[in-house]
Amino acid sequence: LVGSEMCIRDRSNLGTVELTMAIHRVFESPKDKIVWDVGHQAYTHKILTGRLKEFKTLRQENGISGFCRPDESVHDAFISGHSSTSVSAALGIATAMKLSGDKTHHAIAVVGDGASTGGELYEGLNNAGKSDTNIIVILNYNEMSISKNVGGMAKYLSSMRTKESYQRTKGRVERMLDKTPVIGKPVKNAVRNSKNAVKNMILHSTMFEDLGFHYIGPIDGHNLEELEQGLMAAKAVNKPVFVHVNTIKGKGYAPAEANPGEFHGVGSFEIKTGNPDVVLSDSFSSIMGKELCEMGEKNKRLCAVTAAMKYGTGLQYFAKRFPERFFDVGIAEEHAVTFCAGLASMNYVPVFAVYSSFLQRSYDQLIHDMAIGGCHAVICVDRAGIVGDDGETHQGIFDVSFLTSVPNMKIYSPSNYDELRLCLHKAVEDDSGICAVRYPRGRDQSLYDTSDPVSTYVYRHIEGAKVLLVTYGRLANDLFTAIEILRNRDIKCDIIKLVNIFPIDNEVVDIMSAYDAVLFFEEAYYCGSISEKYASICPNVAQFAIDGFVKHGKCDVLLDELGFSAEKMADTVEGFLKDE
């Protein structure tokens, strides 16, 4: 396994080796544009397109991305990261080809079946099927995304796995008619044009044909010859084509085949057994999930909702204990929020656990379906802040900016496990509207006891300090360390760690106003940040936040580059005071 020493998504890529090879043998990249949905399946594609030597740097600092990046290779036709976007992008590319007079080449969208739970996929299919473009949609069906696929579409696609007899029988009938003298071709064409003579004997038309696609499949995704034949047939059709490919996720590597979900985003592992090199202890996600279980025992109206991230968000514990109150809605964040609003309208308390970067998709629903109606719901914003290896598309740096624009929103940002438990209870018990609890990826690495079960913030004052440092969340630990570094440099600073970060706390404003200078360090996007809001009230506040997209790399390295390590924050404070 190339990359077993790195953190990669082996299952998706082992299942698509033959498919990727067939695509590159049949089509001419980059003239033909290959658009990978999400990009988890694209590692073989990266290797085949000249990045084998660099593959050992995958998802590492200054290495190649774990997703498709047009600025990395001309063979990466479109950026990837979030699910269900490929058909829309490929249709745009195919339309541009048509407008440019290119009637020869194709735009190929490669979609995993996990994306079949996402609404944007169907918006794209609905538009693409009736278009007069050279678009080919390849569905890689393996019955497994990150968690088990859910919903009616998963059942529909599963049922189609068993209906390969349709394509075989149709082919035999057409070959027989070809050999029939005189009337063979006319009869064959009549059968094709009406669709009913053959199909109704064996299989009703697929939904993809009803949308306007020429349907090919199901094809054995591990039979290279069959794949190439199917793709050559798709290439020859002068209309939108849907190719249905069946694969086994983790094909050829027994530990990956046997353990669904466990090889998604897996860390480095022992190649013979598949066992991880490091056994992770509790994380913010698992603590949230376990605490929610305890709360669910007492509150029978508490429900947990995920968008296909049961394991990643720690909700597997709640799902096991309260299956009737656990809901996995698939990769459908927009639907998830409105679904939660419906639960809330009937006096249930929904807790939607979602990664920060995926919550971006739900902005309209947060306002229109939840906030306007005054719904009491809890949003557990996992992976808030820098997440590291997944890069620009997954860094959780925008949630503060858009959540603070929603009226009556409350936002908590705990810095340790105790605060997380406390904030979760507060959010569930506060029935005045939407409460968001945001926390970082990984473990609690606090070195200081900075929790206060009563106050909405923690304030540490030393005599003679005229400078105040402010932060919240994960940065609190390093900022307390920076205070010690500065003390050794004979620089006295006070500190406030916010826990309830929004709405703005008037007590905190009063405290800030008493200092000569306030330096606010924030692991969030600059525009719309909490520091920006305090700076608009207190002219003595200097902001140090993130101003742009953040590439992939290790969290500690990225935080240091952004100026958020203890040493860098201490240097910033010292430099700021010298310039004053």
Show the residue positions of the predicted features.
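Non-catalytic terminal/interface segments that mediate subunit docking, oligomerization
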Residues: 33, 247-359, 365-375, 471-473, ...
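Glycine-/acidic-rich phosphate or pyrophosphate-binding loops and their flanking alpha/beta elements
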Residues: 229-232, 264-265, 283-298, 314-320, ...
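Cofactor-binding active-site loop characterized by glycine-rich and histidine/acidic residues
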Residues: 9-131, 301-302, 306-307, 315-316
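Short, small-residue-biased leader/transition segments that mark boundaries at the very start
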Residues: 1-8
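Peripheral docking tails and interdomain loops at the edges
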Residues: 268-271, 276-280, 388-390, 409-410, ...
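Generic long, charged, amphipathic alpha-helical segments
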Residues: 328, 480-484, 491-511
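Structural signature of the thiamine diphosphate
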Residues: 187-255, 376-381, 400-450, 517, ...
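Long, well-ordered, tryptophan-enriched scaffold segments
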Residues: 143-288
